[in-house]
């Protein structure tokens, strides 16, 4: 696993890490692919004269999330139903818990390319309600290649959430990511992805027409990244998304703009992130309102601190000699304003995640 060793020779490890952080922040990059990229970084640091070989590791994780508005109750506490205003039922504060594991197996194909296969399973439970309880099986295949100053990353993925109280769905997709180093401090990145989601219309939910939400999503973005002082990164990105659905009132198009700041600290990596997006829906949903077209303006703010637990609590080195326990704190605020009452909401979520990595083969 020494895929980005060429880039490491060109620059410092800190700047390399900042460049990779831009890929880790990309919402089109799957969790499995993010884990894979981070493993590449670790192995580069550990190998002075790397040789092509197989690698395998197992991640076991636990996450707890505090949700201020888990059911997305509107700001007014009301909603539209057939042009009338009604009370918005639902739960606000609640906690969710996620326990899971993922296994990654891969091989360095050459001094500048590698491939990996990932499979994961997680179980999600809720403290008070049940709407968000599920188990999730997923998998992905990632291929990485360095060509000159380009870091190319195509991937395919599949997920199958098994919902407790709502229709199950299957999602499969493909994506492509490239980061190009202009010089020591400047780089550009671009990516595109496609996914298709299909809901399971069973006898139990046949009356609800859940397959009306079946959809295909196309997205693309381009970004610019500037690093300075070896430990700072400013990133910006413009994206465009088009969602096609079986029923056009579930379909939309919309642009978004993201700006972020990343800094490497002694106790972890700090990320500050802000995204502005506007989604315009193709048709009115007459069950909701016959004369109002839906348009959503969404602002998402995020603060995240992640790293090895030994960076945060040094005395844990006695129990984690290899530095294979990772932590992640994340605070997310989603402020949605919409032309429809039920889609205007404020959500604030705080999560803590612990990951233990077991090296199976290296």
Description of each model-found segment:
Residues 2-362:
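Gram-negative and organellar
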